[in-house]
């Protein structure tokens, strides 16, 4: 197999003078060789096999070392010819490889060379070889000997043989010469020459030191015999540096690299494409550098599993820009891939310089993380109600608390599309809010009002849930009239950061009046969202108590003819459209005796007071209260002008209080009275669906989400006959949110119950700054309710009692009176504790009857037998004993077998169980499970257990099964009492042939009786005949 071409070697500087001396000697030797041509020709003829290695120029054999020792050429030939030469021919060819120079040199000293001696070539050559072999001169001086190129060409002309062929004649001649060597061939051995021969022997050392596997420098291709020499060379020349980072043009073109280094020799750009950190986008030259970077920075933990998105570095985006992006980012989960071009074109252009790898189609890893942070509210979103969360843990808590994961998984097809606030809806809202106030009793067109309310309230919910306050304020400004743009601009700025009322809001907006209303709407809607989130962090909001406890102002009225804002948890990213239903209703004053609205919480107070403060100035006009009620303000539509807001009267405050309380409670009969401010009574009491303000919606949402965790509290004035009606409504309308029905009833004094409604204590901030506190505050102070707690406490209580409240209760049979049923259940429990026939097998939770355990333990102890050495060994209970236990206790044979197998397994594995220790030592200790006393022998243990049981084990078989069946008949009597007579009659009508003795039920087949005994009474089917009788026999 031909070898690779290699470059000519570079000589070390230390050998230059020696080579010059040798070249001068070689010229003289050439002249002598030409004189004695016959000997040289014979020498050359026999030298073919070795000279072909020596004489091949750099183009033929490539590079050899500056030490052209004979062993190197021999081993080259050895490597190519698979070591065909023998040891003898190795030595002879080593000597011959000097190529005639040494031979002629020695002939000059030992013989007189005459031209006629050319015919005696065989004898002369034998003597010459013998002299050369015995002399160590060749091995000492010929180590660094190298022929010049001209001398090689001369030798080439003398060598007529083909260089690639193996010279069989030379091989045979060498072997014959080796056999005829004289004894003086080893007479003058040299230590150096013997070591050199030992190193050059391919038979002993293999190919480690041959020329084919010299230690080579990769940069200059110099070859060395030892690794130490190569190391010294690389340290001196600096060739040890890896040249992977250099371009191909800097490397020698003829240098061929092994195939395994192909990956590392890729272009730098290609390598950077592959060796790239997916998080920060840095490129690396080697896999080791990338690994070190990943381990140090822990970026391997942050590699996102997302498709590439436009590169936006998180370091470049300020919080203000992030807020802008939050406002402009897509709203629905269906369209999370929004356009970033408008808000972030400059950032993207600047960041293109940072991410040099963008031209390869890769994206900076930081953009993934920033994109996730930016769209986190879209990703961590409840699919049921649309609430957003900061962390996955918060979303999980919300799903668990509200039970939304059940609704999402069960109703994936209920996803709705997002409602967009179109310009038409904006116009409708404006026209609705600007309606003339003289028209209060006119019927509203249901279609217009429905669409208006739907669009506006949906938009409000969507915005508040998305927590995009800037966009919210923008929409508000579009919808609001020109009068309120300026006063509302200031107070709405703080609500970008705080969505609850603060002291500054009250101070800044005390003049306009609409700011408190708007801030309170933000408060309520955010509170609804937080309540739906399930895990609100109350400390995160500066003045949430203020938002819930506004009690210093007077209460505004709520007209009867407003709309119902029916809030349900939405299935997508927002609340459902809050469906309005308009009815024509007169302005009727409400009675205040309706105490059953006991769920009047602090939330109702804040809303009332805020609206009251806005409209307390002129309490005489009631005209605009119908169209500009809290429903309009809650929709974030245009708030009425100053003149309209000041028309709310104190008499309608009572209506408002009654309405809110009743709606918060649950659907209740509301009792309109005939008292208006002018004293005229309106007889039209048509049933209508009054407005539910955001606080009522909050209560209903909490009730719906938290599983009605709080029962309505009965206030002292709850003794009216309407309480039973309330309870009926409460039971019948669990599915319905808030649909109060107006029914005529008797009227009571408004002042009786108003004093119990509101409480003035624990007020965090004073909401009546720069306001007049005349009659309104005095009225509010008179309304107190000691049993009421803060809204936050109520919500916290709801969450606390959530697991108990959501646990399904067994439906009680309506046919059995409650008292009788309770007595039967108690009796049933007493009987079943006496004899546990209804077993609940719950794994490791022990539901064993202690009496059954004592019987089993006694039987097991009686089965132990004692050896002659006094040790006790295990034995098994026979089928007869098991049958006796099964008949007496009612346990199935399977249960008994499992208990015995478990006990024996524990004894074999650990040497003891609960009632038996040290069984592995042969001297057991028995423990009583009732009194924990210890016994050494089975007999004393059994007698002790019999004292607990009240009978002896040998008498257990004599005890009749009838005694047990009497007890079980007690149980069956209780259970059959709960069965409907129709099913019993139906069973009796069928062709029943078999009857269960234990419960008196009849069955058609024996198989049915066996199943019944096994499942109901835990009886083994093997002895079912004891408990079954034929109906015909009776």
UniProtKB/Swiss-Prot annotation:
Name the chain's protein.
Answer: Teashirt homolog 2
Species this protein is from: Homo sapiens (Human)
DNA-binding region listed in the record: 841-911
Modification sites for Phosphoserine? 980
Gene3D superfamilies listed in its UniProt record: Classic Zinc Finger
> Residues annotated as region Disordered?
1-90, 239-265, 432-496, 598-676, 763-789, 1014-1034
Q: What does this protein do?
A: Probable transcriptional regulator involved in developmental processes. May act as a transcriptional repressor (Potential).
Task: List the GO cellular component terms.
Answer: chromatin; nucleus
What is the name of the gene encoding this protein? TSHZ2
Q: Give an example GO molecular function.
A: zinc ion binding
Q: Where is the sequence biased in composition, kind Basic and acidic residues?
A: 459-482, 600-668
Question: Zinc finger spans (C2H2-type)?
Answer: 215-239, 275-299, 380-404, 926-948, 994-1017
One GO biological-process annotation of the entry reads: regulation of transcription by RNA polymerase II
